[in-house]
Regions:
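Active-site-facing alpha/beta catalytic cores
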Residues: 1-110, 117
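Glycine-rich phosphate/ribose-binding loops and adjacent secondary-structure elements
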Residues: 67-185
Length: 185
């Protein structure tokens, strides 16, 4: 981000060009923090965090609940294409937790309309947790992983765009059975 909190293409290109970075994921939403941004207290913003995040050392680092670079499905896809280009062609995609199914369908429709496809989509389950999420939201916001993954796969398949991207899962996938059951979808 630049000092105003907006996307900085030059800084992104510089960072994404690092050899260790193999792909770029845009976090649209997360099951445990639906509709919430985050605050890293200034006391935890040391010199290294300040350098990496591009924020002043010792000041609260506020991550907004939304992206300033896009606000519609079409803009999300255009932004995905832009970061793919700025990263030198590295795979680019996004992560989201299914909340309102019609919103995911709108993204699918925008793929068809624009002919822009992410390289991957990561479906996060409502049961995914984070220490930064409100306790009331843990395990209760969005669609659980299995249902969300199945919905996304079927929506992409039904719209004829599933073959354009990989679909991955993110949530409480901790055992061999969890992995096998998601792969079976």
């Amino acid at each position: 981000r630049n000092e105003d909190g907006n996307f900085d293409p030059g800084l992104f290109h510089e960072t994404a060009s690092i050899d260790q970075i193999k792909m770029v994921e845009i976090k649209v939403s997360q099951g445990a923090k639906a509709g919430h941004g985050g605050v890293l207290p200034g006391a935890k913003v040391d010199a290294e965090i300040a350098r990496v995040r591009g924020v002043p050392e010792g000041k609260d680092c506020i991550s907004p609940a939304f992206h300033t670079a896009f606000s519609t499905p079409t803009e999300l896809l255009e932004f995905t294409a832009k970061i793919r280009d700025l990263s030198g062609g590295k795979p680019a995609g996004f992560k989201l937790c299914i909340g309102r199914p019609h919103e995911f369908l709108a993204i699918c429709k925008a793929m068809i309309t624009t002919d822009i496809y992410p390289d991957f989509i990561v479906i996060d389950g409502a049961e995914g947790g984070t220490g930064a999420g409100p306790v009331e939201f843990l395990d209760h916001m969005g669609v659980p992983l299995t249902e969300g993954l199945l919905f996304a796969h079927n929506a992409l398949l039904g719209m004829g765009v599933r073959n354009h991207m990989r679909v991955a899962a993110s949530a409480k996938v901790a055992t061999a059975f969890n992995i096998a059951s998601r792969l079976a979808i």
